Design a protein with these regions (language model features):
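N-terminal FAD-binding dinucleotide-binding subdomain shared by FAD-dependent oxidases/monooxygenases
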Residues: 2-10, 15, 20-160, 175, ...
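Active-site glycine-rich loop that binds ribose-phosphate moieties when present
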Residues: 170-171
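Rossmann-like NAD(P)H-binding beta-loop-alpha module
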Residues: 181-203
Length: 297
């Protein structure tokens, strides 16, 4: 490999939920291993720092999405984005991870040397424009699957003629006031499911457009089992028992969706009908064309 480069044992790419978690594990279980984290943005937290749209929250329960080494202690199983971000940064502080993060470092190339048995990773600094290199034995890629630069926006014919604001929820305008406005939300995925109910209290009219329906189920924000266990068990036990309950239920639900998809589909759509009443067109607006096992609810 050409040129000098700082040498470490492990390079972690990304300081979000996965990257911080991996760094904490290295600090705890491999204290003799040196590591650096490349983070392209100016702050840690990844998705939970970038996304600022109203109502942002987890669409998975935090007992399974949180770290096994750091119990989730909040009463909300479906947590707001601010709580998740605080949780990630608390973990980073507890394990002294912050000093290992190189902010505004975007990994742009990686080269393997068979003779040296090491990677050489090049990063570009957004603050100075210079390129820096690190040599490492292992790369732990935690960059996620979102394009942080820009969310996907279809080519809508005539959008340039629209006189109002058009923007992607991923890049929510700071201090946006939508009080009394007429708003159209395009899409009915996880973002829309959290965004629309929150905005509906302040807009004069809110319409959500969807290309095709997705499976939706109503679940309590707080887990009733965890709430009951908190009355007589320590927080760590509550976390572990609730976490395993959630994991086993998800395994059961997945297997049920594979073995008896029609029955599970019938049950979920029945729950929707019960929520909306007999006069709502559930077949048109809430009945997906795909099987349950192909995507999360």
């Amino acid at each position: 490999m050409e040129g000098s480069a700082e040498a470490v044992d492990v390079l972690i790419i990304g300081a979000g939920l996965s990257g911080i978690g991996g760094a904490c594990q290295l600090r705890s279980k491999c204290p003799d291993q040196s590591f650096v984290i490349f983070e392209s943005r100016e702050a840690s937290g990844g998705t939970w720092d970038l996304f600022r749209y109203p109502g942002i929250r987890s669409d998975s329960d935090m007992y399974t999405m949180s770290y096994g080494f750091k119990p989730w202690r909040d009463s909300a199983a479906i947590a707001d984005g601010d709580k998740i971000l605080s949780y990630i940064r608390e973990a980073a502080a507890e394990y002294d991870v912050e000093r290992h993060i190189r902010y505004q470092h975007r990994a742009i190339a990686a080269q393997w040397s068979s003779s040296e048995k090491r990677w050489r990773v090049t990063a570009e600094r957004s603050d100075t424009g210079e390129q820096v290199a690190i040599s490492c034995r292992f790369i732990f890629s935690c960059s996620g699957y979102y394009d942080y630069e820009s969310g996907y926006v279809p080519d809508f014919t005539g959008v340039e003629d629209f006189q109002g604001q058009v923007f992607h929820a991923q890049h929510w305008p700071e201090a946006l006031d939508y009080t009394g406005k007429r708003v159209v939300v395009i899409g009915s995925g996880a973002t829309a499911v959290t965004l629309v109910p929150t905005m509906s209290h302040q807009t004069s009219r809110l319409v959500m457009l969807q290309r095709s329906p997705t499976y939706i189920a109503n679940v309590p924000q707080e887990d009733p089992t965890a709430q009951a266990l908190r009355k007589f068990l320590p927080a760590t036990w509550v976390f572990r028992l609730t976490r395993w309950k959630k994991v086993l239920f998800q395994i059961y639900l997945y297997r049920l969706s594979r073995r008896r998809p029609k029955d599970l589909r019938r049950f979920l759509l029945g729950q929707v009908r019960q929520e909306l009443g007999p006069d709502y067109d559930v077949a048109k607006h809430f009945t997906p064309r795909y099987d349950l096992s192909l995507i999360h609810i």
